[in-house]
């Protein structure tokens, strides 16, 4: 079974490595080089870099095809057709495949999705699970369908959550844990396809693409909700607020349980209440107190709260804009 793998970010790399080492990988489809870092130098995708490493190791041949089309057009489809792929395996590629592309794969396509479908269909399932305070998420391998994330389920793996995960850590966990599930599906693909079950439409929930402006903190929200948002938006788009019109990124924070009634009495949300030497800078929210432990000024380094205050001694006066 000749497999074409489509993926772009680092979370796709473990699945790529598995297929390259244990199955018949005939090509890789990934996004073209893009500007990265402070200098905005053009850089290959994490998936493309991983393929080049596999070539260096001798796992893949020197002339192994890496396709990086800007558009999924007729020219790219000719390149695909030449590979004679039978199955498409996709994880976080970043583009949607139309019927003309899918017609090139006799066995169709499958997608690795980091949620327990039909919960959290869409482009940001990991942040969505953290934002919602889910206690359980997981990985789904589904058939590729015309409607996004609506394919039949070939396999699922549950991952319990403990209210400490960030999107970065949870996505990395999903990337590693998907490999045994993917091996199981690909090793017995014909039978898995026969046993595939449709999703329960009544249980479907959708998440939308995150935007930079979504990271603005609304201090009128409960502390619990803001804390989840900070974890869900790590590393991107990040959470931020403003103080005296200066943008301040909130990198890490925790719920603060030791507040006295006197401390919070008649305090408006967004007010900086002071500090706790073990927890950080204390912020009044719409319900409860948030202890901020790592902050960052624009174009500056991330700092632990004590170091941050050493460079900004007046920071504790007043509060954040709401």
UniProtKB/Swiss-Prot annotation:
EC numbers: 2.1.2.9
Enzyme class: transferase
Catalytic activity from the UniProt record: L-methionyl-tRNA(fMet) + (6R)-10-formyltetrahydrofolate = N-formyl-L-methionyl-tRNA(fMet) + (6S)-5,6,7,8-tetrahydrofolate + H(+)
Keywords, comma-separated and alphabetical: Protein biosynthesis, Transferase
GO CC terms of this entry: cytosol
CDD domains according to UniProt: FMT_core_Met-tRNA-FMT_N (cd08646), Met_tRNA_FMT_C (cd08704)
Pfam family, one: Formyl_trans_C
Alphabetized GO MF terms: methionyl-tRNA formyltransferase activity
InterPro entries named among the record's database cross-references: Fmt, Formyl_trans_C, Formyl_trans_C_sf, Formyl_transf_N, Formyl_transf_N_sf, Formyl_transferase-like_C_sf, Met-tRNA-FMT_C, Met-tRNA-FMT_N
Residues that, per the record, bind (6S)-5,6,7,8-tetrahydrofolate: 115-118
Keyword Isomerase set for record: no
PANTHER family to which the protein is assigned, alphabetical: METHIONYL-TRNA FORMYLTRANSFERASE, METHIONYL-TRNA FORMYLTRANSFERASE, MITOCHONDRIAL
Main function: Attaches a formyl group to the free amino group of methionyl-tRNA(fMet). The formyl group appears to play a dual role in the initiator identity of N-formylmethionyl-tRNA by promoting its recognition by IF2 and preventing the misappropriation of this tRNA by the elongation apparatus.
Family per similarity comment: Belongs to the Fmt family.
Protein name: Methionyl-tRNA formyltransferase
Organism: Treponema denticola (strain ATCC 35405 / DSM 14222 / CIP 103919 / JCM 8153 / KCTC 15104)
């Amino acid at each position: 079974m000749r497999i074409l793998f489509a993926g772009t970010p680092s979370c796709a790399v473990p699945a790529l490595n598995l297929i390259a080492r244990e199955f018949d990988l005939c090509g890789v489809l990934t996004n073209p080089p893009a500007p990265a870092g402070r200098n905005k130098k053009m850089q290959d995708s994490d998936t493309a870099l991983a393929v080049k490493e596999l070539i260096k190791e001798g796992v893949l041949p020197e002339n192994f095809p890496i396709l990086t089309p800007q558009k999924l057009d007729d020219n790219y489809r000719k390149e695909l057709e030449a590979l004679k792929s039978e199955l498409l395996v996709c994880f976080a590629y970043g583009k949607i495949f139309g019927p003309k592309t899918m017609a090139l794969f006799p066995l169709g396509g499958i997608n690795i999705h980091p949620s327990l479908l039909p919960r959290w269909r869409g482009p940001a399932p990991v942040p969505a699970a953290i934002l919602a305070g889910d206690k359980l998420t997981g990985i789904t391998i589904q058939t590729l369908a015309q409607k996004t994330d609506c394919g039949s389920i070939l396999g699922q793996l549950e991952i319990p959550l403990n209210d400490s995960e960030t999107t970065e850590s949870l996505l990395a966990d999903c990337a590693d844990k998907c490999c045994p599930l993917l091996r199981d599906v690909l090793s017995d693909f014909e039978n898995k396809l026969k046993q595939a079950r449709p999703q329960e439409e009544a249980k479907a929930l959708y998440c939308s693409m995150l935007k930079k402006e979504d990271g603005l903190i609304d201090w009128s929200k409960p502390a619990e909700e803001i804390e989840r948002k900070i974890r869900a938006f790590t590393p991107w788009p990040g959470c931020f607020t403003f103080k005296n019109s200066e943008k301040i990124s909130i990198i890490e924070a925790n719920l603060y349980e030791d507040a006295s009634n006197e401390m919070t009495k008649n305090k408006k949300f967004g007010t900086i209440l002071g500090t706790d030497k073990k927890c950080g800078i204390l912020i009044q929210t719409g319900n409860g107190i948030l202890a901020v432990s790592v902050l960052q000024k624009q174009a500056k380094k991330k700092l632990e709260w004590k170091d941050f205050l050493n460079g900004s001694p007046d920071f504790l006066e007043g509060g954040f804009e709401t």
